[in-house]
Amino acid sequence: MASKFLFAKSFATTALLAVVLALAIGFVKPGFTNDSQDKKVTIENIPTYKLELTRSSVMIQKSWNYLLSKINSISSSKLRAQVLSMYQNTAPTFMALYQTDKSKRTVYEKLLNEGLIDANTVSKENLFPELKKLTIIPQPFFTAPGGSLNEHHYYPGGLVVSTAINVKATIAALYAYKDLYDYVDLYDEAVAGQLLQACAKPFIYQWQDDFEVTEDYLIAGAKASQVIGLSESIFRNLPVNVIIAQACAGIPLLSAHDEKTIVKAIKAAAIIAGRDPIALGLLSFDGESLPTPHHQSWYVVGQSSHNEALATYAQKQAIEALKEVFIKTYGMKTSDLKDKKVQTFKNYIGSQYSFMRIHS
């Protein structure tokens, strides 16, 4: 059951309204202590359990509380509940459509016939990551990384931190518009779209026994984590403009080429969700462009979703620096750097201290 990944202990002093909302609909926060702080630990005693790493991190705690508070700030009660539900249940509900080999083959062939998938890189068997049961989440939102080893926020809880930074950027843009243009009518669409932009990563990036994660792949020229997330939002009947804003998070709407890429991602997502994107209003009547007029929220989410550029660079540089530490300080060989102990150490540094701080 999904509840076994969640903890009933909550903060009385942080994000109080978010906690009240969460408890009201059955969602509870992982248990932290109010005096959480960075603690010294020997390399032999580094925690390996993902929830243990995330529960002990001040950075992840702050990010998680922030996300809950911003979910609670959404004025629409229906949308607020939908977003919170997707944070609680990271098992894609649309997977109910794909419980047989025949159903998986059918959707795979549809994507293939529409030119939305490359048979050389993605097979029918690998179209969806493993999901043992619809009622068991692949992992909590809370433990997922923000990306793979060669991307960004690659540590347990990285998704929470990455999403929090992007949401902060989105809200900062909205406040700037309020201050300078004297309006902020985009709040619900933009904040919800940004909160959901990486909602499929707990499904896509599943931690393995060797402390690596399953890799992302491409659907319709976009990352599968983005397309799968859009499929889930479509299947759960989220508002059209929230879904399009979510689509623009990974592919900013800067040119006609970008729009074509977003359209392809939405087409693929709708096929997977078993819905008609034109009938839903996600695409124009000819299915070749986004509906007009464009909503400003789409652009706001797109322009505030690029923390990954710096985070990816910082992570790569930090990991290279850590390799030198392993070799010079601990006497390891290059061939030892894939050892579980090394992977555990990198996860610990990322979650407790951050690669950004190492790089700075």
Each language-model region and where it sits:
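Acidic/His-rich, divalent-metal-binding segments that scaffold phosphate/diphosphate chemistry
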Residues: 38-214
